[in-house]
Amino acid sequence: MDSLDSLFSLRGRRGLVTGASSGLGVECAKALAIAGADIALVARRKDRVTRIAAELAKTHGVKAIGIGADVTREDDLDRLMAETSAALGDVDILVNNAGVSPTGRAENFKREAWDEAIAVNLTAPMMLAQRVARRLIETGQPGRIINMVSIYASVASSVYRLSAYAATKAALANLTRQLAVEWAGYGILVNAIAPGWIPTEATEGGIAKPGNKGRMEAFTPMKRLGLPHEIRGAVIFLASAASSYVTGSVISVDGGYQAW
């Protein structure tokens, strides 16, 4: 590892990103493509991920495919793994980014919304990580799993009422640590990224509510919100040889929010 390229290049690698039709999912896919990985972009909106995949392939000279799938369905998980393997080869970088963030007062929170948060934010990442890890173990190949959590995996929200989101992201952060311990011996490194307040299609509505943006900036030491592309460096680091002795970690990309 005597050059910058050898540390961070992902050429010859194959990544899969869920929730890749918008927001940070697109940025995660861009990060892998910039570093040279072939990628499968997964989301329920197949038309969008297919279009984004074509753009990434043209811009970065990588293979990229879009797959329409619901990550809470076992049959869809099996299908997306098969389609990715057929088009690109076996996945050795998984980015579990798909998520939902239902809001509501805890005392009135609906069971259906609670169950959906668990299914999308916790169960789906585990089921997909299982599938990727089994194949890596079977073939004796190393790999990387990156789970997207949140600042609310470790602190409560003073801006939103996010009981289900906070609980599931905290669970995913600790699942990250557990999988890191169990799979380290196979060369499968499992880490997480905890983004702070970053405007995306999913978050811009809440940020735009009166007073919210100012409060968020005030609570952040850097005194500004993040930019979507600022997630890319952490993704490339955790997917590449640069993080070869890093597993079980949660990397904050939050402008210092959790450093208070």
Tell me what each language-model feature is.
Residues 2-7, 236, 247-260:
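Short C-terminal tail/terminal secondary-structure segment
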Residues 46-47, 68-79, 111, 229-230:
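The beta1-alpha1 cofactor-binding region of Rossmann-like NAD(H)/NADP(H)-dependent oxidoreductases
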Residues 105-106, 110-118, 216:
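Substrate-binding pocket helix/loop in short-chain dehydrogenase/reductase
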Residues 134, 181-185, 244:
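Alpha-helical segment proximal to the catalytic Tyr-Lys
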